[in-house]
Amino acid sequence: VTSPLTSLSLVSNSGDAGYLGSVTIDGTMLRDPLTVNGDSLATNFNPFNTDINTVRGQEGIYATLNAKDYRSFTNGPTYYIYNGGLTTYMSGGSANASKDRGLVASTMDLPSGKKWYCEINVENISNNDIALGIASQLVKGYYELGGNPKPGAYLLRAAGQFYYPTGQLGTDSSRSWATGDLIGLAVDLESTTKTITFYKNSKVLYTHIVDESEGPFKFAAGTDAGSGNDYKLNFNFGQKPFKFPPPD
């Protein structure tokens, strides 16, 4: 049997004990230490980099939060959008009436005939003056006083209040969510009965029928908070693997 090993090289420096410097197998030299071949340059790519601008960027078929949506401008609270359009920081303010205190919304409408899903990591909320869900372009804020309907909106507040086009549900701990929760939003515009389902840490939190004529909708979040309160949400529209599998 012919060995593929064709040579060995022993190296000794100034009388020191020698070491194996290279091995040649089938004409290929394996050396120690490694040396650069030609004009090769190091790369700054890091496979463990979690910065979305570096890993994937903002281009592609995925939604992000829309920093150009006028509702995210200063409307009492101030909305900051960063991390490639996937993180929003909200700082409370009271310049406008409650129902007009703004939203952050996705760049894409949710087209009819499909199922849509996103996850929201609730990194911090100062109180329950914040809501998540879907909203049409007509919605300028999540909050309406006194149980009034909220046309174009299906939004769940942290204390469990739910705002929808023909009414409002009151506080309910069974629908509540808080700092540290991972909220999934599943919108089914494909089935005969259209629905939005809210998940908390993979468990169903609440489901409501959607009137598609109130749309088109975008994923949205907003706060009604006054000064001194802040909130931070991290969205995933599919740019990265979801923590929990989307529903069928």
Which sequence ranges carry the predicted segments?
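Noncatalytic modules at the cell exterior or secretory-pathway interfaces
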Residues: 2-15, 183
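Accessible peptide chain termini
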Residues: 1-2, 248
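Short beta-strand-plus-loop segments that form exposed binding edges in beta-rich domains
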Residues: 9-18, 222-226
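PRY/SPRY (B30.2) beta-sandwich protein-interaction domains
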Residues: 24, 28-248
